[in-house]
């Protein structure tokens, strides 16, 4: 019935704003309306779930489309929420980046790993578990979208030129799995837990670690799991934040798995022995200014 009232109001508003138009013009417009019929199996198909997943042309919705609909469609304040949060997020991330962001955001927030096929259900579970409102969820999404944009391009207004250079260097190396760790590190920077100098040291460490692994041909399969749990494992004791950078270094150096940081000797040997010219690897120089 709310939909019926909405259309009545819209039609009346249209007629008031366009006195030269009449009901016949609306009928003419309806003749161009295309309807899609989707037959459901009474036993297995849930109509609400199906309409959550398709757009007006019957094309499957993307993850970001489904999340947008979930947090906006049922909210009476949806126009303001859209303009204050969602539109701004769409303006700073491309469609593909927004899809990648939501997978990384979910992996950052969840205990396990999100897959594309289950990501929307995981998002709804996160929403319920965290007792979010639509606005609090959109506020958090926009906060991390801004971080994600900075990870890709830097942010001259928020961060120093050194931080921005180091972020772009990580992006040059295509080390995007590190974002699962950086979300928390940048939260600490925003909260004043660490300063610019410490943030730069952490980013240089991650860049050093990444380059050593690339040159020494250490497989990257385990990196996502490492970075997902790294913050919690390093700072499982709050006092470790008093020596923020040293705590991260100490943890990485104590690793005995395949995620161990390659030693200086291993790195030098790899530089001498590997045929680096045949590798499709992009290199970056650290910035110390």
Protein language model regions, located:
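Nucleic acid-processing catalytic cores of prokaryotic defense/repair systems
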Residues: 1, 26-33, 38-48, 52, ...
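Glycine-rich phosphate-binding loops of NTPases
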Residues: 1-21
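Short, functionally important structural connectors and interaction interfaces within domains
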Residues: 22-25, 53, 162-165
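A cross-family structural signal marking well-folded subdomains
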Residues: 34-39, 62-286
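Histidine-centered nuclease catalytic patch
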Residues: 289
